[in-house]
Amino acid sequence: MTTDTPVPTWTWPEERLQTIMNRARAGRSFKPSAWENGAKCAVGLSFDSDHDTFELRDGGKSISALSQGQFGPRQGIPRIRELLRNNSIPATFFVPAVSAIHYPDEQRALIDEGHEIALHGWIHERNTLLDGDTERDLQHRSADALETITGIRPVGIRTPSWDFSDNTLQITAEMGLLYDSSLMADVDCYELLLNGEPTGVTELPVEWIRDDAAYLVMDRWGGLRPQIAPHDILQIFIREFDAAYEEGGIFQLTMHPDIIGHRSRIWILKELIGHIRQHKDIWFATHADIARYSKLNG
């Protein structure tokens, strides 16, 4: 007689623990002693342009949920572009292929304004639910789609929902991508190891603390309700930046056009940029430029 009861983790042998822990792990730090043009701190602003795909990825067809995603390209992106343009700040937009295909002019306009377009899955799928061949196919197709639309081959990836499978790092390394921005082992860039071996892929780490969705997502049917006022979120982001500045490191921020792009919320980013601009020795850069500089100078 067989049973599907999982083996208790406290009975796992050390070899199994090491295999799991070392599949994708942080290697050596790539923190440079100084940044481009002698800047003390690098600032990388990023936006995940999920748009309609957040509803579509699991087969959802809710017109209400789709309309919420469509707020991103209709209202959020224009507000973000204007704010970045007024402050001469380059940023990185992680774009699911389906979003890029349905909003191609948006991607071309962002490229024309000096921003980076990077990988964010095909339809914001969860990688841990895919077999390796499917994940590999979708990642290659996504890169091809973004290149066709923008004319530039993406060099970086952020996995949808930061969902990182056992196959993700190997596929990313096989594709020769410069960086990933989905993991959280540090505040500075570091090299990613696959089964203990260097991959050549640089990690530009993220954190839920520095993600607008962690504070502002509303789930109509679930228990998620925004409980933090915009002013308080701003103070968290300012404290994160101030610490990064004192350490001479990176201030990385993850945002979403359909979240931060609302009128009462874009204020957070506007005020944050104003605070950062009070410091003269700042390098605003795309994630690709930060990862590349860190790898060469760290």
What do these predicted ranges mean?
Residues L224, I228, D232:
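A short glycine-/small-residue-rich loop at the edge of a beta-strand within enzyme catalytic domains
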Residues E203-L224:
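Glycine-rich, positively charged active-site loop/lid region within alpha/beta enzyme cores that binds
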Residues W221-R225, Q252-D258:
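Short, local alpha-helical segments
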